[in-house]
């Protein structure tokens, strides 16, 4: 797995790192799994958290160790985190852009539950495989890996909303917060030849559920920690439905506004073309030759009125 590093605005409402920081909360004992150079943990420390980390890359781990209480250099495939850190050692375990790199994310997620103190939570971020850019690219027969992003070449698992929630539930957890980051299907790193797409397809994709969701950021707790699982699941589905409806309405309004803007621009272009053609005709010798008799006729007609 490559080493990732990032600067981010902790106040942003549309950034997975800032959303994770908010879902973790202040003054927590945190394990940052796949901590890289410690950029996320640094923001958590600034909020009063005590942070430990796990990282496979020794150089990145060395940088994080200058900030964290402890950094374990290990491969998540075979490390026993509970044996190393102790059961119930953390208020929050963070899995930021980790699960998609794991051949068996189910096993990892079930394992980290043992690290949670009573009332603890797991905070997860992962890309959305149903983002509109990927839908459009697949319509054109494209699935091209990149160094970063939705099709990071090191991703081995892919999640939509239902798949991610099923993974969480399978680990004995229930999602209490699901927050999307959003990006327009034509505004990300995925290669889409949009002029070649049929009319209306892009707007249709924009309006689909999660068509503009770039990443999911989730907070999950033990299923028995905050009451009945079914009640929480039902309420979560209701909230998700309300959110999707609001986002769909917003996307439809945006699409209508964009279509109106395009129609206006096209009309302005047509008017400009017509004006240029008119000037071109008026500048020809034939037009000037015909214009002189018309002016004389106009003068004569005006004289007769007098």
Q: Which residue stretches match the model-derived regions?
A:
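S-adenosyl-L-methionine-dependent methyltransferase catalytic module, highlighting the catalytic core
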Residues: 6, 14-15, 39, 59, ...
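Conserved alpha-helix/loop element of class I SAM-dependent methyltransferases that forms part
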Residues: 11-28
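Conserved acidic residues
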Residues: 28, 69, 91
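Conserved class I S-adenosyl-L-methionine
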Residues: 28-34
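Class I SAM-dependent methyltransferase SAM/SAH-binding core
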Residues: 39, 43-80
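A short acidic, Gly/Pro-enriched loop at the edge of an enzyme's catalytic core
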Residues: 82-92
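Short catalytic micro-motifs in class I SAM-dependent methyltransferases
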Residues: 96-101
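Boundary detector for helix-to-coil junctions that initiate low-complexity/charged tails
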Residues: 221-306
